[in-house]
């Protein structure tokens, strides 16, 4: 399976979940991301485009994820990368810290396609946004707290065991195992 990402950490996480089922190779392809409020639509579109770009012979997976902030009615959601690139985590925290409702969720969707079928698998983790803490992880990890720790304070192993992407990858692994029986 080719995992379409430039993030080696995501590839390693996928390898942990899929090791007994398939090999996972990183595929660096910059597909055009459609604008949609649906993570599943974005990931499925990306997987289908990447499958063609990769030669159409090996299955591919694409993941899309976002931070959904309660006090902002779920924004930035699918637009999280754009907001992070534009404002940065510190500025997002500056906006969020004034909110009464700082509940948040990381939601992710992994899309798989082999050219014949496209399937999507979603995962989420609930938390709260807090002042930045920790030095690990990436993106919004320093401000996303789950069970008393920010994702940036957790070990990679602990974070991956809890993460939205990990939960989606576990569902993909179950589906692949059932399909291959």
Model-based region annotation:
Residues 2, 9-181:
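Anionic-ligand binding patches
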């Amino acid at each position: 399976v080719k995992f379409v990402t430039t993030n080696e950490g995501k590839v390693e996480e996928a390898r942990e979940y899929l090791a007994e089922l398939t090999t996972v190779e990183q595929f660096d392809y910059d597909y055009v991301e459609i604008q949609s409020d649906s993570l599943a639509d974005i990931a499925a579109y990306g997987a289908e485009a990447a499958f063609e770009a990769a030669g159409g012979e090996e299955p591919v997976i694409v993941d899309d994820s976002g931070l959904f902030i309660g006090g902002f009615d779920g924004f930035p959601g699918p637009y999280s990368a754009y907001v992070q690139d534009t404002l940065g985590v510190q500025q997002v925290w500056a906006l969020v810290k004034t909110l009464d409702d700082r509940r948040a969720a990381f939601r992710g969707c992994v899309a798989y396609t082999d050219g014949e079928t496209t399937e999507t698998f979603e995962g989420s983790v609930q938390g709260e946004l807090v002042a930045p803490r920790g030095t690990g992880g990436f993106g919004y990890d320093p401000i996303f707290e789950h069970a008393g720790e920010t994702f940036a304070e957790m070990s990679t192993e602990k974070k991956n065991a809890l993460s939205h992407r990990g939960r989606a990858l576990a569902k993909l692994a179950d589906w692949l195992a059932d399909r291959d029986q």
